[in-house]
């Protein structure tokens, strides 16, 4: 057992016979989560994080946050602006672990009056976070598994990490399960085309980029984890997530990080421009050149990078905001993505949540043209102040017996609307097809 501070305890075990999925299946408890990095994604993160049995939950709707304490069973209501309340309520505990996340909040957030998932048939909070004192870290580089517990209350008794280690090494798992779904409703291409064309015609100096949701709804029966496993196998990405809430499960994959904060270092990796991988190395390189040389994509990407720079300058020392990598082609299993990396130094009086607010909000402190539309992000806010959120690009929410699927479409004045529609239609068909498992569709 290693002690890193009076409140933080760690235990490291050999994980060469384990996987994040196996650990998750053996882990006992409620409100479990799994944040994975894809080993098949170029530049993917080193760690995956697993947890269960949160200490408390924060659920924000409008200008109110409900705090549910699982220790006392009591619910507290806090009134005020969402990010102001989150900064006040999120526990901040210094520790010296080498991991980017060693305990804290896991969940999702939208902006303004919208939720992370835009669908009138499902009501989700504007923000929903579980706070975990105990988490499990899987190191993909060393195959080590580290169990970490951080006490929110200094006087609270420490849990038995030896017992937890035995649970994930020798614990029982249930038999493999399956799922079935039956599509019910979808945004029609005709109506979506009308929306896209109308929005593009109204782009101007104040609104230069639009993020729009396109949704599908289906009946769902079976195991939500089986659905996630099928998704991660067929569509690996830099970010993969599965989070259980009281009455719904959020799962999905995303190639795009929204924002990361590590101490005073702020990192954004905007992504704009995607094309399929080639079947051979030569075709892959040909697709890469075509993506890189496409003028409309480069213009849209440059516009996005400029917008993100301005957003970061509102929360960082302005002179510190630099484009470290410009228009780099990044590879995932199925696609090529054009990304840039922007870094800055956080202003000392600000919180990591101020950075999230600046980058997810359509109206930050700058006068630079902003984004219109609806989207959200999912990730963690650590006790140590670190933060990492991914855009919830292609997400699934399972609520009761209904599966809500949503994709987000980004458009600028340089976007070819017809190409976007063809791409969306193809992605939808491919996305639904890859979910078919053991006769998954009725």
Q: What is the role of each PLM region?
A:
Residues 1-59, 441-442:
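An N-terminal JmjN-like helical accessory module and its immediate linker preceding a catalytic domain
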Residues 37, 71, 78-217, 398-401, ...:
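Non-catalytic accessory segments adjacent to catalytic cores
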Residues 10-14, 23, 146-167, 260-333, ...:
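Cytosolic ligand/metal-binding cores
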């Amino acid at each position: 057992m290693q002690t890193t501070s009076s409140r933080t305890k760690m235990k490291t075990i050999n994980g060469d016979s384990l996987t994040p999925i196996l650990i998750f299946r053996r882990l006992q408890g409620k409100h479990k989560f799994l944040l994975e990095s894809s080993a098949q994604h170029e530049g993917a993160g080193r760690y995956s994080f697993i947890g269960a049995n949160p200490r408390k939950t924060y659920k924000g709707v409008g200008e109110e946050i409900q705090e549910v304490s699982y220790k006392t069973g009591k619910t507290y209501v806090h009134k005020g602006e969402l990010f102001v309340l989150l900064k006040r309520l999120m526990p901040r505990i210094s520790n010296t672990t080498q991991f980017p996340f060693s305990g804290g909040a896991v969940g999702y957030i939208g902006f303004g009056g919208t939720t992370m998932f835009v669908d009138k048939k499902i009501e989700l909070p504007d923000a929903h976070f579980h706070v975990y004192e105990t988490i499990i870290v899987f190191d993909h580089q060393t195959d080590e598994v580290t169990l970490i517990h951080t006490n929110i209350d200094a006087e609270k008794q420490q849990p038995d990490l030896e017992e937890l280690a035995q649970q994930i090494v020798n614990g029982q798992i249930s038999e493999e399960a399956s799922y079935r779904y039956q599509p019910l409703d979808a945004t029609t291409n005709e109506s979506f085309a009308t929306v896209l064309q109308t929005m593009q015609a109204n782009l101007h100096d104040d609104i230069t980029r639009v993020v729009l949701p396109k949704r599908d709804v289906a009946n769902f029966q079976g195991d939500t984890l089986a659905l996630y496993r099928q998704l991660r196998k067929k569509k690996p990405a830099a970010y993969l997530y599965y989070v259980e809430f009281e009455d719904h499960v959020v799962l999905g994959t995303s190639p795009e990080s929204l924002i990361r904060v590590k101490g005073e270092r702020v990192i954004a990796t905007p992504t704009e421009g995607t094309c399929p991988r080639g079947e051979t190395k030569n075709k892959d390189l040909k697709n890469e050149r075509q993506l890189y040389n496409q003028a409309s994509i480069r213009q849209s990407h440059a516009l996005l990078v400029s917008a993100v720079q301005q957003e970061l300058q509102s929360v960082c020392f302005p002179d510190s905001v630099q484009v470290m990598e410009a228009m780099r082609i990044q590879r995932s299993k199925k696609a090529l993505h054009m990304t840039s990396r922007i870094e800055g130094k956080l202003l000392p009086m600000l919180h990591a949540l101020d950075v999230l607010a600046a980058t997810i909000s359509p109206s930050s402190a700058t006068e630079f043209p902003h984004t219109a539309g609806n989207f959200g992000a999912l990730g963690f806010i650590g006790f140590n102040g670190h933060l990492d959120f991914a855009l919830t690009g292609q997400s699934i929410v399972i609520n009761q017996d209904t599966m809500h699927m949503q994709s987000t479409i980004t458009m600028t004045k340089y976007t070819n609307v017809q190409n976007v529609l063809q791409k969306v239609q193809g992605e939808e068909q491919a996305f639904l097809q890859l979910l078919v498992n053991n006769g998954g569709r009725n």
